[in-house]
Regions:
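Early transmembrane hairpin module of multi-pass membrane proteins
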Residues: 1-112, 124
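Terminal transmembrane helical module of multi-pass membrane proteins
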Residues: 110-111, 118-130
Length: 130
């Protein structure tokens, strides 16, 4: 793992709102969850080529909102992985979807798995609570 300077976490909003410290940083992630869910609902009602690539993207957007919200509840190096993991889970299928639409449908489909696979690496190095 690449070490992160602990000063990185001092940007977090320090105000309390609705009983939550870092309130605006936490609550500002709700739109990601909403947009991701809306995308999944939209996909369910439309015939979209490579729909599963775009479904993976929208799941990643939901995970971005949840992971970033979790990180901002208590900003620390130990929770930062959840903030970044959601984003990379959205980026990989997004790029695979662009490749599928602009280069080759089969190439985009084949690339989703290998592009998502590196996301599993940080999970093996998460710090254990004692």
């Amino acid at each position: 793992p690449i070490p992160q300077d602990v000063q990185y976490h001092h940007f977090a909003d320090q105000r309390r709102l609705l009983g939550r410290l870092h309130a605006l940083n936490v609550w500002s992630n709700a739109p990601f969850v909403g947009v991701g869910m809306a995308g999944l609902i939209w996909l369910a009602g439309h015939d979209v080529p490579q729909w599963w690539i775009w479904a993976s993207f929208f799941v990643g957007v939901v995970l971005t909102g949840l992971g970033s919200g979790y990180y901002h509840l208590n900003p620390a190096n130990t929770s930062l992985v959840w903030d970044r993991l959601g984003m990379t889970t959205a980026f990989a299928p997004f790029f695979a979807g662009v490749i599928a639409e602009r280069v080759s449908a089969s190439a985009g489909g084949w690339l989703v798995g290998p592009m998502l696979a590196p996301n599993c690496w940080p999970l093996g190095s998460l710090p254990q609570r004692r």
